[in-house]
């Protein structure tokens, strides 16, 4: 008790002294010139600013024409580098075929289980694994299997079969316009687009063996170069990274297809087998990617249409739409793949809380 009285007395005495001091008026405070002229400290950069700076650094540092866009589907903001450039899609355009087909299924025009027969004269050019299954009587399959081959294996013959199913390339373009997917172009289909870009005219032999490559190599280099440059100057399958990430975000949010068809397409994209060293090569444990790749023709050191677009999902469920499009580049293959991986890593790093350590 004695100690308590002593403490109380001290507090009372101190309070009286403080009151006495406070009663004495002090001169008004005036800021010095240095304080008046000193700028306020900038707030720490946010996730969007950090990601924008890194995306711009990556895009500007690549030897070629590059477009990159990232859209935070959860919060609605986006960053980009050259995001409005209209660049060749190549097989990225297979996404719009799938959306057109599934939209027709939603309307009741046909079903996933409907049968489609593919004959040798229906085959396409370049990568088409189902070609080996087409015998003298054709190959009987379903729309569901063609969609899986088109998205997951980037099978050109499967893609062409689905285009025929919905009414041709123009039907796909009508679907793109009808769903307000920006300025995305679909193009005339693989046969015409690839042969024209090579300086050739389509003929059925190009579906087999090395006939396409042999004829292309016989062309005078100047003719082939002129054809490829004409394609790059005005790609019939052009799209901008910003339009693509906007479309992917709308797909994720269920704005383009029925809930069943949306889930179906996203599941197909999760099983994509191409592009292991592109965006997917930059993932960390716990992150998921649903995507579609595209790859164009190569002439000497010039590579065209190297793309990967998709939806990156964080362990906490936040989703980012990402598009990396390399319209043309003389950078080595490894550098092109590294750019796509670096973009994925940049998104992941920007999502991570400040000071957090990446998982091992």
Where are these regions (language model features)?
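Tryptophan-centered motif/residue detector
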Residues: 77, 96, 201-203, 268, ...
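Carbohydrate-binding/catalytic loop surfaces
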Residues: 139, 200-207, 288-296
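Structured C-terminal helix/loop/strand segments within mature extracytoplasmic catalytic/sensor domains
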Residues: 3-6, 10, 17-58, 169, ...
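A short small-residue
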Residues: 77, 133-135, 226-229, 324-326
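Active-site-proximal helix/loop microenvironment
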Residues: 183-258
